[in-house]
Amino acid sequence: MKKIITSFPNLLLSILLCFVLSSCSSTGVKMSDSSPWKTIQFQDQANALDVDFIDNNNGFLVGSNRLIMESNDGGETWEKRNLDLPSEENFRLIDIDFKGQEGWLIGQPSLVMHTLDAGKNWTRLSLGNKLPGQPYLITTVDDGVAELATTAGAIYQTSDSGESWNAKVLDASGSGGVRDLRRTDKGDYVSVSSLGNFFSTLENDSNSWIAHQRASSKRVQSIGFNPEGSLWMLSRGAEIRFNEDTNDLENWSKPIIPILNGYNYLDMGWDPNGDIWAGGGNGTLIVSKDQGKTWNKYPIAAELPTNYIKIVFLDKEALDNQKGFVLGERGYILKWNS
């Protein structure tokens, strides 16, 4: 009798486990023999946070500890540059964006810089002390026109190269603060609240954020747009989801869990072939060539002592071929060579 009573809780646990697994899609991961990525390691141990190119050869990479580097050979090699900033100020340079020779660079705390000559000279702009939150995302819209988004969900636009800024959002509280924020070329935004308990959207012609419930009890890690404009979501527990109806942002696919290694995915990106890449902690970099049904893992990426925090594929008119980078911590990045 005691044996029967002891085994009954185990039976319940097994049934519960089967139920949980049936609600997920666990694809398994194969190891690829070759990789389209080239490893680049900087002597500086700072974390790379963003990269952008002006043309096929000239580009800039920015990161923590005031890191700014320039490439003149398409990203094969990089040289460290210095900004005219007080030595006692330690900025996290988090975003950089160019359109032609004009570019914008933002950092934390409260840094916005502007260039008109492809990064040869940078001018620091004053934001005053009334800006809600810290700069998070900068987009070069047109000549002298840029949009600045902050960690508070506020969005400002300048039409005079940063001399003045006008608010585009009447009430930023609907975003719940920001832990992740993305923008489409059309000017639509999506953000994850600071606690990851919901996400919000902002259409280009709207001045208010709309909050949406997350897809499950798991907190949202990051969210973004695929090339067609649909949303994807990365949640705690290494879960990947895709929105199945752009008119219904509560309608999400079952969670896809390619690897159960205890590390979360931090970003996703689509390469020129339409393959989906996901990167995360402990050197995790995986790819799906069939829209998320199956996934492959790359050994070169897994061998590096880093977390992959951002995946960037640059597709702009100034570039003959799309460029790709995976940005990691501790001075590691990967460059797309396919």
From Swiss-Prot:
Signal peptide segment: 1-23
SUPFAM superfamilies hit by this protein: Oligoxyloglucan reducing end-specific cellobiohydrolase
GO CC annotations on file: photosystem II; plasma membrane-derived thylakoid membrane; thylakoid lumen
Lipidation (N-palmitoyl cysteine): C24
Keywords noted in UniProt: Lipoprotein, Membrane, Palmitate, Photosynthesis, Photosystem II, Signal, Thylakoid
Record note on quaternary structure: Part of early PSII assembly complexes which includes D1 (psbA) and PsbI; not found in mature PSII. Binds to the lumenal side of PSII complexes. Interacts with YidC.
Domain notes from UniProt: A 7-bladed beta-propeller torus, about 55 by 55 Angstroms, with a depth of about 25 Angstroms and a central pore.
Similarity annotation: Belongs to the Ycf48 family.
Name used for this protein in its record: Photosystem II assembly lipoprotein Ycf48
Encoding gene (name): ycf48
